[in-house]
Amino acid sequence: MAVIDVKQVCKRYNQTIAVKSCDLEVGSAEILALLGPSGSGKTTLLRLIAGFEKPDEGHIFISGRMVVDVANSVWVAAEDRGVGMVFQDYALFPHLTVAQNIRFGLRRTSKKERQIRVAELLRLTELVGYTDRYPHELSGGQQQRVALARALAPRPRVVLLDEPFNGLDPDLRPQMRREVAQILRHLGTAAILVTHDQEEALGMADRVAVIRNGELQQIGSPEDIYYSPTTAFVANFVGHADFIPGVVAGTEVRTEIGIFPSPPHLPPGPVKVMIRHEAVNAKAGGILATVEEREFLGGEILYRLRLPSGATVHLEQRKPEHWDVGHQVPIEVLLPSVVAFPTFSSSEESK
């Protein structure tokens, strides 16, 4: 059964549609990432589920219980929805110790039950030695663990995380993502993670929901989102993608780099074919491309290459070869499956 079930939810601010006709399910023990750029509506959708905002249309169910039915004026307050919440700034109580912060959500249980649960969460989040410390005495990673422990204390079926890694040092984020995911999976707690960081979404979630301008563009596994995007926006927003011109003719897509089998849904006519950076390789005898730009990234060099048509692709070179701007490189493009879209405007292609 779905722990979260959102049906046709809409939210407007005056004439601006923040969330448009949203349908979304989160399964038991599933981690779902809401991924989108700034202003896409992802945080608004999370707040609607949490009960911090009221939708203008739609239904929301949590653990099978209806908490929102706009048409029939059903509204369950945030504190009665049974969800945990981890805020971007952690929102810890500065005057309470670590143990007191965790204990805050357990006021309806006995003293003994509170002690047992706090001790359990301190062990789980590796905070046993920090019981009596205050938030200002903790590192960012430790504060985040306290916030997660507090959210998990009442044993919610689902935890909502609003960009929880933003305030951490970049070097610490991957470790904290792994720790948070490990804790959630150990407890079997479902979660919705709001993020604009594709690495977070792809690396941490069981499924990813890409949102843009208040509309869900695609929902699927990280692999599906990356390798089989259904819109040009998803293709360009998730991962690094270039697009080259092609033409669908019968069962083929014809491009200047080769002829490929056409996906069955594509109508005849001009298309843009997605080329991921890792699909481009240097190979003797391949089509000649001209180096327009090179960027040294430490373990690799990223080259922007211009094809004869003027379209550009990128090549990630990990070999110690050095090509100057203007050098011609023979390349091949390996496409296990073709992802192509009808010719679109630059606004559709942009991130």
Pin down the residues of each PLM region.
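Pre-Walker A (P-loop) beta-loop-beta motif of ABC nucleotide-binding domains
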Residues: 22-33
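ABC ATPase nucleotide-binding domain
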Residues: 25, 61, 330-332
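The feature captures the beta-strand-to-loop junction immediately N-terminal to the Walker
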Residues: 35-37
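Conserved ABC transporter NBD signature motif
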Residues: 58-70
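ABC ATPase nucleotide-binding domains
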Residues: 82-84, 88, 92-233
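Non-catalytic connector elements of ABC transporters
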Residues: 241, 252-351
